[in-house]
């Protein structure tokens, strides 16, 4: 089976200078992949020519005349730039010409346009960015990592349901454990949104283990950690900054003297393994969960190596049938949760807003 993906080549801080080289390298390593490069045709062709890949049959150019800038308001991306590389790439997924879209573009715009073009799964009001973060024994699924800066309690419950379904589908766990990210484990901690979300989670049939703190993220305390997009994005980027700082400190210390340089040579295999484990670029690419099609969000600042990993996330998701498995697990979970009988003022599948697909407002999204 050929895996067909659309690439928003104009998205991110660096545009085609990063996205096109990453795409070329990816198809050369994955002969069953076909990438549709969406964007300003002349800019894409210039990069392909430089890479001697103009005639590569695994790559095709899909012209788009507009670009969603990283600082564009959601309304501009959604209502004015209807021929943007982001919109065209998503339209090809909607029309069945590709199985997933990968973009490093403006997060808020990507969330809003994806939601409008592709629609959400039944019972889901807002998509959430989800990713598996490493822990000592495996991975912890965390969401939301930046799609929704302001959330209501029922949105956090829905994120938990999606995280539960994804872990159940991919890892075969019947009862994945759920934690709510907070400033303390006690139920009295947190703002009113967090407290109310905790009440909804405790009242649900999910395997909710209570509040978790920031230092639990990489411990493997629970299978799924739920938070709003503001908190999740700050936590993620803080982690990346810390990993980079540790790498820089080790490099600096081993370069201080001739003796330390000799020690570095002896320790080189260990140092290389350490560098690989803490290199956040290999963790680039997070799924926008809750949509009827697959969308992978890359960091806007990603280099070609990191963006290639984002493409791989989309490729692997298609190969592993993630969307189909998630949809089935969500349907099964909806039945187990009582088909929306949460006492949440509209939380869960019975929410009057669930499944509503009017154009989202800027207040619901972030641009980070």
From Swiss-Prot:
InterPro entries: FA_synthesis, Phospholipid_synth_PlsX-like. Keywords: Cytoplasm, Lipid biosynthesis, Lipid metabolism, Phospholipid biosynthesis, Phospholipid metabolism, Transferase. Gene3D superfamilies: Isopropylmalate Dehydrogenase (3.40.718.10). Its EC number is 2.3.1.274. Pfam families: FA_synthesis (PF02504). It catalyses: a fatty acyl-[ACP] + phosphate = an acyl phosphate + holo-[ACP]. Residues 335-368 are annotated as: Disordered. One of its GO terms (molecular function) is phosphate:acyl-[acyl carrier protein] acyltransferase activity. Pathway: Lipid metabolism; phospholipid metabolism. One of its GO terms (cellular component) is cytoplasm. It comes from the Bacteria. Homodimer. Probably interacts with PlsY. This is Phosphate acyltransferase. It comes from Burkholderia multivorans (strain ATCC 17616 / 249). The gene is plsX.
